[in-house]
Amino acid sequence: MYKWNLPYRKDDVETGREGGERSLYPTMLESPELRWGFIRKVYSIIAFQLLATIAVASTVVFVRPIAVFFATTSAGLALWIVLIITPLIVMCPLYYYHQKHPVNYLLLGIFTVALAFAVGLTCAFTSGKVILEAAILTTVVVLSLTVYTFWAAKKGYDFNFLGPFLFGALIVLMVFALIQIFFPLGRISVMIYGCLAAIIFCGYIVYDTDNLIKRYSYDEYIWAAVSLYLDIINLFLALLTIFRAAE
């Protein structure tokens, strides 16, 4: 279609694109409109995941018999272990089928609900003040880092180099957690663990947002959503750990 048939379109001299399409980053070759559509889809999925997590976790927190069942019975303990392991197990087929509809959505639902139960059980034995503080700070941090990453990408910065460092830091964090389980070191060590976890997952939010802008293919919307959802949930749990230890 000729340009004169679309009077509302205007060449963007700065980016060299027609219709005023603005690139998300300087070396962008794909259509910004398609990439923005992909980004909106991923954030829509994350929003539904977070809403489901809030709904399930709130049910666990406010319906006290649920928390009591998990905390005081052997069956509840066994079910709690199953719920902790389920997200890890489901991630394997979810990664394999993340491009196959509707299996990917089914697995995503199972993954989200199981993780939401684990979050709910953590919150059930935490004061409301601490939960609110962690939730507010998580929201502020996630929004700030997301805006910063989009701005940095626009300016030409790239965060792909963070991948190996974050993975190494995550391994250290997991070893620290195992040590803490078998050899509890007290409140100070718990706060140190929470601070390290918060820093690491802040880095992962920047790293995964950068991948969302530049690297994920359009068929990888499920895996992109899972990555950022895990970053947000883990950041919340890390902040919850810090505030609980400081309370």
Swiss-Prot record:
Keyword Chloroplast: no
Protein name: Protein LIFEGUARD 4
Similarity-based family: Belongs to the BI1 family.
Protein's organism: Arabidopsis thaliana
Entry keyword set: Membrane, Transmembrane, Transmembrane helix
Keyword Ribosomal protein in record: no
Segments traversing the membrane: 42-62, 75-95, 105-125, 130-150, 165-185, 188-208, 222-242
GO CC, alphabetical: membrane
InterPro entries: Bax_inhibitor_1-related
Topological type in the membrane: Multi-pass membrane protein
Coiled-coil intervals: none
Disulphide connectivity of cysteines: none
Top-level taxonomy: Eukaryota, Viridiplantae, Streptophyta, Embryophyta, Tracheophyta
Subcellular location: Membrane
